[in-house]
Amino acid sequence: MNASSKRKIISQSEISKKIAVMNEEMQGFWANNSWDIRKCPHPSAIELSKNPALRNRWVRFERVKNLWLRTELKYFYFYHLNNGIWNAKTVWIRKGTVINKMLDFLDLKYPSITSITEVPIDKAMTEYRTYLTKQGVRITTTNYKITANQEKTPVKANSYYVTNLKQFIEFIEDFYFDGEEWDKDVWDRRNLPLPDDKVNPTQYEYTINFKGFRNTYFKQLVKRYCKLRLNMDSFSYVSDIAQKLKEFFNFLDIKFKHVQRVHQLTRVEIEAYLSELNMMGIKPSTITGRISILEGLFSTLHRLEWDDVPSKLLIYPEDYPKIPRAKPRFIDEFVLEQLNSHLDKLPEYIATMTMIVQECGMRISELCTLKKGCLLEDKDGYYFLKYYQWKMKKEHIVPISKEVVLLIKVREDKVSEEFPDSEYLFPRKDGSPLKQETFRGELNKLAYEQNIVDKLGEIYRFHAHAFRHSVGTRTINNGVPQHIVQKFLGHESPEMTSRYAHIFDETLKNEFTKFQEKLVTNNGDVLNLDDDSEVDDVELQWFKKNINAQVLPNGYCRLPVIAGGCPHANACLDCTHFCTSKQFLPQHEEQLERTEELLTIAKDKQWQRQIETNSRVKERLEQIIGSLTG
């Protein structure tokens, strides 16, 4: 069997038809064998051609004399340019000299083939690496990445010269594939009829890879199962299912070669696999996930009555490890202060995203897919942020401060000018939403470069979800009722929010004291936070669920921060929005003492207005102090 049939490539006659289709699509400028960027109709080429520093004007496909190969090459670049995958800069600048080397190699090495698919990809890549090395061209490049330990480390990768040929061969093999996308060993989500809610556009995960299975039968079984699961689950989760089942069945093939079908499985193999997992040193939650995926497969085989099903129950409840109650991975204020002091060193859009997520605590996918027009304003001038929750598959609305509103408005103006066709607040150059990895990468790069450290002096590693944990933990610890936090974060159940109801040892005593203290209004009335009628009060709801509640020198203002600065300077004691607690008692006693002194002077001098004002202040303070000490 030749290499082409192994890869399920269509017949030569069908390839000839495909070549004809390629030529039909490449009309006008694209039919030329030399592409001049100054004549290219692609919008990105028109813009790039105006750059006086542009050195590489031509892509000369005529260097390849083999007409079949030349057509495949031209179509490879034509397709990527006209389907939004690449822009002109990618072809004429990034791949400029790279293309010429590849064209010369193909013309030299394969002058007589009728398709690049006649050459096994491994053979072609080996020959090309040898060719480049003899030409004095580097076949690897060194990139640097920030590791999970916040260390900068070099990473070797194939150079553009090597990857360009690999991309070309894989593209043509895919184009000539004899079958549906489901028949391939690598499923590309862009070629599958998946609804939008199955695909998170903020992730780089484009494929589900079934290569690497040691047993072909089990590979086909897993492919069928994954196709079924795509009806219920997200693309990224099904990709994880495929990888975890590959690990299990490869384990079987290595340790229990005699097991060739699912119905041959016994507890012996399962227990050996569980032991293997436990010896890997992975977290209990990770082990639970792998067992759950395996049990899900076995359960589905039984329920849907597939031909090959387990002969007995293989997974028991006691197989699942006990998972410790997860503590919220909040970001310490010590770290946040450092981060915020260096926001100016981040790209403008990343800094804006950081401010939004610190206040609203949304998930990273929700942050990246914020859309233009996400601000809502009510009749009182208060602003709210509207965004889509990918996990819950629903729209969510939260109150937002005027400071962040201003940042969003500035960003909207900028994006509308630079990316008028994109609906997103933080788009990539192609108009799609920013990828999660870009946000995380920029924050951790900043932490490394600016030496943002934790209290132990270690460079801090930012995880996007930790901002959500920080908002949840901070609000719970500040006494906000759990059901309010649940609504603010958009949790479906109280259990999802309860993980934030954790006060850490360092602040346990102080937080408990704060929780127990009384809140008193300007009239000395006690606010009972557990009273249902008080909880339903609109102003107190705002006070509780506003993350950035306004703290005064002698108490709190129940007006939400979103309302802006108070126009009534030094009038808190006469304001119905004012409330205070026992921790401010010394300030009230000191103010009462000063007020009594001023009142004595006013009476001596018979300053009637000052007597009235200070008498009212004295009365308010006495009511407050009496309630706090009573």
From Swiss-Prot:
It comes from the Bacteria. Signal peptide: none annotated. Residues 216-302 form the Core-binding (CB) domain. Pfam families: Phage_integrase. One of its GO terms (biological process) is DNA recombination. Keywords: DNA integration, DNA recombination, DNA-binding, Transposable element. One of its GO terms (molecular function) is DNA binding. Residues 326-513 form the Tyr recombinase domain. The active site is at residues 363, 391, 465, 468, 491, 500. Belongs to the 'phage' integrase family. PANTHER family: PHAGE INTEGRASE-RELATED. This is Transposase B from transposon PsiTn554. It comes from Staphylococcus aureus.
